[in-house]
Every structure is written in C-alpha cells, then in structure tokens.
Amino acid sequence: MNFIIATRRSKLAQVQTEIIIDLLNKKHDIECEKLLIETVGDKILEVSLDKIGGKGLFVKDIEVAMLEQRADAAVHSMKDVPYEMPKGFEIIAIPEREDVRDAFISLDNIKFKDLREGAKIGTSSRRRAAQLKLLRPDLDIVPIRGNVQTRIEKIKKENLDGIILAVAGLKRVNLDHLITDYFDTKEMVPAIGQGALGIEVMEEHPKKELFKDLDHYNSKICVLAERAFMRELDGDCHSTIGAYASIKDNIMHIIGIFERKNKIVKKEITGTKDQYEKLGIALAEHILKD
C-alpha cells in the first residue's frame, strides 16, 4: 500500500512528516512518500499573518491537494489549524505531544532576566509580544517571520538581542542546544495546540482508519480542550490568545489568556478530563465575564 502525505516545504514541516511516517511504519506495512507544497503563508514573508489571512494560509493549499486526490493525508502543526475545519475534512489523529513551552534564544547567551533595558526581541506572534510586555514593559518588540533557521539568523542580521521560538520546533530540527531560557507555561502561555502534530484526512477517505492507531488520547483531548476555548472566543491569528491544557491523575487543568478591552485576561480551570470540551468552553466564559 502506498500513501502520499502532503506537507509544507520547510525543513521543520518535512521533519514532522517524517515523524508521522515513522510512526505509521511501526504500526502498518505502508509505503509513504511526501508531497511538498509551498503554501501562500510560506510565499508571503514580508507581511504579518494577520494582514494576509491568518495561519490558515499554511493549511488551505494542502487541503486542495487532498481534494484533488494528489495526497491521502496531511501533517500539520496543530497551532496552524483553524478551529473551523472545512466541510469534508477532519483531524483523524494527534500523536503524543512534544514540549509545549516557548524558548528564548539570545545573541550572546544572555539570560532573559539579564537583558538590557529596551532590548530588541524578535517575534511575529501577538500572543508572545503581549506576554513579553507583561514580563518586561521596556522591551522593544520587532516583528520577524520565516522558518526556524531564518529567524535565528535574523538575530545578527537585524541586530536583535534575542528571539522567541517554540521549543518543540527547535527540538525537532535539532537546534534546541541554542536555547538560552525556557519560559514557564504560566508566564508565557503557549499557543493553542503548540507542540502537537495533527493528521488531516478527508472524511470519506477509505483508508483513514489506519491513522487512528497514531492517536495519543491525552494529547488529543488536551488540544481539543484548547481548541474549544479558542472556538468559544472566536480566536484566530488576529487575536491575542493562548491556552495550555495538561492532565494529571485524570484531572485536566487549563490556563488561558485572551486580550479583551485592551487588557490581557488570564484565567485557569480544573476538572475531570472526560469533560475536556466543557472545560475549554467554561474557561472562555470566565474570561468573557471579566
């Protein structure tokens, strides 16, 4: 059996797809090949995502490949997947999640707490920028886009004091040795779905059940809880929004942030994990009441 899996052209996207292919090969005797697609989000780098259509731009062109039957499935970073799935598509599996934290990479290995006043920090994320300002109001936030390696190179090219990147991506491309500091998930609440990969298929695909074996239940319901939170707040890349759900002894804890009335609101909620979607919605409702 031969499967074609669509993904973006970046090194990180290809590595993430190889992770899924390896997991698939351990479960089934399947030959897989990658279909590399340059999405609109990859082509337009000089403009912030919220001005050109949001993170869904990384997904739409790949879904077209599945619609045209050029691919059987797609691998995405779940943080790039809009909460409203197009008709006929579904996320069939979410494997075990990687480290969800954000990392600080500095020019000369200077710790975040030791940064000079007015230090220039690169990030294109509204979520990260807002939380950085809460931690250090003096910081000068500089928007940067591009793949992981490009952003790292911009530290020197753009005379930055440092940048913020997801730990998961750095680990997957073996660049985590460059990390200067790790942010705790309470001081820098992650993006919805950060660190998780999702396998997207068309609902009518005859072989889609083969991917279900790759599903990691706790990882999946944590991401679904976060996405329920985002859906209730109608959040997207235009929003300053983040959430992180974790499970211990069948108890789910979710921390979420959302910018409302020009103020960052942060709330937490705890409950049994079987109520994961209700917890995400309830957390959003708490924030809207603030």
Swiss-Prot record:
Gene3D superfamilies listed in its UniProt record: Periplasmic binding protein-like II (3.40.190.10), Porphobilinogen deaminase, C-terminal domain (3.30.160.40)
Family annotation (Pfam families): Porphobil_deam (PF01379), Porphobil_deamC (PF03900)
Binding note for cofactor: Binds 1 dipyrromethane group covalently.
Cofactor: dipyrromethane
S-(dipyrrolylmethanemethyl)cysteine modification, residue list: C237
Subunit (UniProt): Monomer.
Protein name: Porphobilinogen deaminase
Organism: Clostridium botulinum (strain Loch Maree / Type A3)
